[in-house]
């Protein structure tokens, strides 16, 4: 097993580790135990006798010089040039050359007008690799990281990061492809993006095959199908060919076959394109560029398994989430020649180009819930990551079952995770509860938590939330009259992490271990960490608030990009792409010099510090980034950034209760108290993941005063208004402590820490009242709307909003951990509790 440490506890002990092993050799459950192994020195590695004695330990070898990197991975050898163009020059498996080149492909489309006519100019860019790094090197696996961009006539566009994962004696290569958009949205439309491989093909043309997965079964053809009129090829020969057998005709059969192949078309090129979530097409053509394509097959969805081969061997391809992240595809070209080309299209040029422009030339602040009335949309700096794999095979074409199994393994790779009980015992990611069914109310709460997750699992499919730039995200708010999410209404459209559905889903997985919840959270993670945030440019380290377009809102904030959204997936999987993102975030407080999150609320000339940060969600998001950098590298500089802010908050009149608006100096990370003001509402201080970050930090810092401040915050939030004014001596003024169900985690923490039974009761009352009133226990009950939403029977929750669902579920998960014992035992007691609810001084959810 190949292992590495990914995080440390403050005392230097190991917190998280990442491991690589051959899952095919392991059972469904494994136990990982620490063991100290002697490492061979470089001098020993050069000693043949030492090598022989330790041959079982010396596994994968990486040789490097100025011109190339050579990987010796048992039966697999890879030559990687350092010339800046190709990912590799040759891949040999079991002594046979399978691939001779691989390089990034980019097509951009530019709209133009000529003599009053609208034109589209398609431009193909060449790749330029600027850096090749051996990112991970171990006994079982090597990861090669390529960084570069594309060029045309001196113009550089669309940076990329490509990772190639190579395993010992493995016939499979895994790729993680990331591109960043740095184009001009008015003229740089994405027309095609992928990686093109060159593979030698040999032998008779009738022994060359292609296969594509369909909706049902496998589409399979030979380049020269031995089905003829005159002379007629024997049926058994054609039947053997369609089974994928190597044909070696003899005698009269050979004469007939050789005669017919002189007078038939050879299908030199095959193309498959999934152009929507509900349609794909397979086409083919002969080599002549002046000839048309023939339609082979139209279908609904393909999982993306594909292969082609010859007597040389075959290549299998599988692009993960093939139809979900449309438009995707493959083009296999020159199959009847000596060197075939196989392009894996992450964005297929057979589909319409991606238009990155905004939907309007202004913002709609009040009416459509957008950040401001001015336009602030920009796609410059967003990214997208895709994953695909290829496998080398000695067969002329793999079997249908092999393609299915390979594709299934790419879509759902084997991952080992701990049990919920194990993670809970070690307080992984702070405070959260395990499911329990000890009484009627607990059963009802667990039922609602499951209903909520199940609803969104189904809603992704029902609402077609698919496509490269959309897949993974949810919509924000529902329109019950149109029976549709408000996809066209400014800030009500795509959610973009608003009120942290990310944390809800990850904690839901942590406590249940449900595989489907893991996948739902994983897709949300991959989208929100890439498309919703900026990885370069003036907004690097910030994300865009919820909008019709993922990059549409003029509000660019740290909370959308914060590491807290992504730490779960990183520590559970060791995903290397997230390491890039964490490095982007570690010092992203400097982005506050470019974009003051409260810049439109305060006069610049009256400020002492150059920017602002609310204690939550702005400063708390920075804390998540700093905490991640601290625990990954034991870099106490980032711990100190956190404590600087904590000490500043301690000096405020009401400590954590104060503000939450502060002036902020990104260079010193100091906060300056400027009074009791809450731009956007006090609830924003605690509904964007702040409680979860603060609670986890509280145990890492061992600062008792900080814990007391958190507890006091939860207590104060639920005080009657007159008591709030009295305790604060009136300095809170008109500041509302609104939407109290969103503060339930803080209230529960306070009740637990202070042993305050009255606070525990108030916390449960507000949290339960937000979903139960007047004896109605329907919760997340779905209803059927016939003939709506282009469905025979539309399943909906007419009042639903992702904001409410995410916050209610997240708070329930945390509150149960702290004050489960104060939960009413049955729903009749719950009804009595919520009937006593006093709403004066609070804004209803």
Where in this protein do the model-derived segments appear?
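Terminal connector regions
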Residues: 37-74, 394-429
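Solvent-exposed beta-strand/loop surfaces of large extracellular or lumenal domains
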Residues: 1-17, 355-367
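Glycine- and aromatic-rich loop/turn segments at beta-sheet edges
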Residues: 2-5, 424, 454-490, 531-552, ...
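Beta-strand/loop-rich accessory regions of lumenal/periplasmic or secreted enzymes
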Residues: 72-418, 471-477, 493-496, 530-531, ...
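Surface-exposed interaction regions enriched in Ser/Thr/Asp/Glu
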Residues: 24-42
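Conserved beta-strand->loop/alpha-helix structural units within folded catalytic cores of enzymes
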Residues: 170, 175-176, 378-392, 494-522, ...
